[in-house]
Regions:
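Generic short N-terminal amphipathic or hydrophobic helices
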Residues: 9-10, 33
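The feature marks the mature, well-folded catalytic cores of soluble enzymes
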Residues: 19-296, 302-342
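Short terminal hydrophobic/aromatic SLiMs and anchors at protein ends
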Residues: 8-9, 15
């Protein structure tokens, strides 16, 4: 009996690491089944859809090359597809050959860029989002009344740079509360504020509140000047975060609204990650996860999101996919007249 007991102890000692390893592998595996919840609305907004359609139709009607000032939208997959169709993307308007066909991106451009385009006799199609154009109009009206204009936004964002160009001597960009505290204006009774369109009411609330305390007579836009799509997608991701263990945001790292969606999800306490495509999915993220929420920034194509969903399905033995509908979007923006009649 002693020899059998001794043999048992030897076998147990040698096998224990293998049993522990097996248990650990089982614990670390993604769960057998998964629930996938897709936020709605998500992905392309009306401004992005319009901008991409302008480039596509211009290529169909006029052929290549079509030059585009800046990335038409902040998504490398969209840009690459259009590049393969004959679009040429440039950062400097002076790079576009004289007399060529050119398109302004959805983010808008400054009056200085428009003047250069005129001097170079470029045949321009304007894909600026109408909501961005509206903000430019607000800046012009404040400038005509000799107001100091506070632009709430990200200093280096291309949209902000275009808006500043409407009144460079009058516009001050602020991105945080400290910058509000440091503001110095020539006349505190003549101050107005405008916002970057990819920010939402939630994003700007604290800064607007601080501005109103600093400048009690400050004027600002109506609520409907805020981009509907940004607000809707943030509301959707908040609702999504309450129903899942992990949120995946499909979008580019240079997409302001995609990065903000990630931040909004994380502020709810849920685990959240941003990815550009299915190729970035990592099984390690899904250990012990029973439900995954998926959304996409305003410049992320639906087929890329569906690729992510397909990739997730492959990682689990079974899956249940459903939409979480927050609000119905029916917004569309008209194409330039020259493309509508062609």
């Amino acid at each position: 009996m002693k020899s059998l007991w001794f043999l048992y102890r030897i076998i147990r000692a040698k096998c224990k690491p293998y049993f522990l390893s097996l248990l650990q592998m089982t614990a670390n595996k993604p769960s057998e089944s998964i629930e996938l919840v897709l936020a709605s609305p998500r992905g392309f907004c009306a401004g992005v859809d319009r901008a991409i359609t302008i480039v596509e139709k211009a290529l169909q009607i006029y052929g290549s090359p079509i030059y585009v000032q800046h990335e038409i939208v902040h998504n490398k997959h969209v840009v690459q597809r259009l590049r393969e169709s004959g679009a040429i993307f440039v950062e400097n308007i002076n790079e576009i050959p004289l007399g060529s066909r050119a398109i302004y991106s959805a983010h808008g451009v400054s009056p200085a860029v428009r003047k250069i385009a005129e001097r170079r006799k470029l045949k321009v199609l304007d894909a600026t989002c109408p909501l961005v154009t509206k903000v430019h109009g607000e800046a012009q009206r404040y400038a005509q009344k000799d107001y100091t204009i506070i632009l709430i936004g990200h200093h280096k964002h291309v949209e902000v740079q275009g808006t500043v160009g409407e009144a460079p001597k009058r516009i001050i960009v602020v991105g945080n509360l400290e910058e509000v505290d440091n503001l110095v204006v020539p006349d505190e009774n003549k101050v107005g504020y405008i916002t970057q369109t990819t920010l939402s009411l939630d994003d700007t609330a604290e800064i607007i509140s601080a501005l109103k305390k600093r400048f009690p007579k400050i004027q600002g836009p109506a609520k409907n000047d805020i981009c509907y799509a940004t607000q809707n997608r943030q509301n959707a991701v908040k609702a999504l975060s309450k129903e899942v263990d992990l949120v995946l945001v499909v979008g580019a790292p240079n997409s302001s609204n995609s990065v903000r969606l990630l931040e909004v999800a994380r502020t709810t306490g849920v685990k959240a990650r941003r990815i550009e495509s299915e190729e970035e999915l990592n099984p390690e993220w899904f250990k012990g996860i029973r439900s995954i929420g998926v959304t996409a920034g305003a410049s992320a194509p639906e087929d890329i999101l569906q690729g992510v969903v397909s990739g997730l399905k492959k990682m689990f033995s079974s899956s249940n996919v459903r939409d979480l509908n927050i609000v119905q979007e029916n917004v569309t923006f008209a194409l330039p007249a020259v493309l509508r009649s062609a």
